[in-house]
A protein has these predicted regions:
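ALDH superfamily catalytic-core signature
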Residues: 207-276
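N-terminal Rossmann-like NAD(P)+-binding subdomain of aldehyde/semialdehyde dehydrogenases
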Residues: 1-111
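Short gly/ser/thr-rich secondary-structure transition/capping motifs
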Residues: 102-110, 181-184, 247-248
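Short beta-strand segments
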Residues: 126, 180, 203, 225-229
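A structured beta-alpha segment of the ubiquitous adenosine-cofactor-binding alpha/beta core
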Residues: 112-113, 180-198
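Residue-level signal for inorganic ion chemistry
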Residues: 10, 46, 68, 90, ...
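Periplasmic-binding protein-like
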Residues: 141, 199-203
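Conserved small-residue-rich beta-alpha loop and adjacent elements
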Residues: 103-176
């Protein structure tokens, strides 16, 4: 049994079954079966499906923002802002797909070079807990637009957000097996990545990314799209010190510090305010 709790109150937010090995295998088989037909659809049809997902997000924005807030401990305004980013990502992805996909030919000294983009297969997407909607959404939407099928495992800390996203995809009317969700912790994730996948799409910690690189070192057929977080220092060298102090505090503590953009180190010169 998997449960998530509101970190501010301790109240139960979500509970449900953890996906075991059989469920993982079944989801991957369904994704593999659905792939040829989904990949063969015209891009315009996939765009329409993603637009329906966007409409579902817009209709559920308040509820989804509240769910994100309750599971992560973010202020409600941050949860709503995250849903806004998810909605915006759809348009960005559609534009990027139109610019980058298809076939491109270039003249060469002894002929032509041809670049063709094609769907790759079954993509596994792992979601982090700090932006449980926006970050996995940034992988799922482009993957589906490109004609891949997706099996998504949210963070075990934010299953309710993942479930709400899955409801939006269901409302979009995707064919069976094109998008599936598996709830669970590390064991579920390891089972997913050990299965029949063609790619792993992940945004999260550098430590997790290093583990995945080692895990797939002997699988050159599996593409790895890893966006790995780290924290850079914030340098406040001159200017309005009072204003800089306000920005520093926001940078360190927004989203309770759980952002890759949160500064954990501050570099300042020695001045009338003292030494650092």
């Amino acid at each position: 049994m998997l449960q998530s709790f509101d970190p501010a109150t301790g109240d139960l937010v979500w509970e449900g079954e953890t996906a075991g090995p059989e469920a993982v295998t079944g989801a991957l088989q369904n994704a593999r079966k659905a792939f040829p037909a989904w990949a063969a659809l015209p891009v315009a049809a996939r765009v329409e499906a993603v637009q329906r997902f966007k409409a579902a997000l817009e209709a559920r924005k308040e509820a989804l923002g509240e769910t994100i807030s309750r599971e992560t401990g973010k202020p409600r305004w941050e949860g709503l802002a995250e849903v806004g980013s998810m909605i915006g990502k759809v348009g960005i992805s559609i534009t990027a797909q139109a610019e980058r996909a298809g076939e491109k030919r270039s003249d060469m000294p002894f002929g032509q070079a041809v670049l063709r983009h094609r769907p790759h297969g079954v993509m596994a997407v792992l979601g982090p807990f700090n932006f449980p909607g926006h970050l996995p959404n940034g992988h799922i939407v482009p993957a589906l637009l490109a004609g891949n099928t997706v099996v998504f495992k949210p963070s075990e800390m934010t299953p309710a957000t993942g479930a709400a996203m899955a409801e939006c995809w269901a409302e979009a009317g995707l064919p069976e097996g094109v998008f599936q969700i598996l709830q669970g912790g590390r064991e579920t994730g390891e089972a997913l990545l050990s299965g029949d996948i063609d790619g792993l799409l992940f945004t999260g910690s550098a430590k997790a990314g290093a583990h995945f690189r080692h895990m797939f070192a002997d699988r050159p057929d599996v593409i790895l799209a890893l966006e790995l977080g780290g924290n850079n220092p914030l340098v406040a060298w001159d200017g309005d010190v009072e204003e800089a102090a306000s920005v520093v505090v926001q940078s360190a503590f927004v989203t309770t510090g759980q952002r890759c953009s949160c500064a954990r180190r501050l570099i300042v010169p020695d001045n009338e305010f003292g030494t650092a």
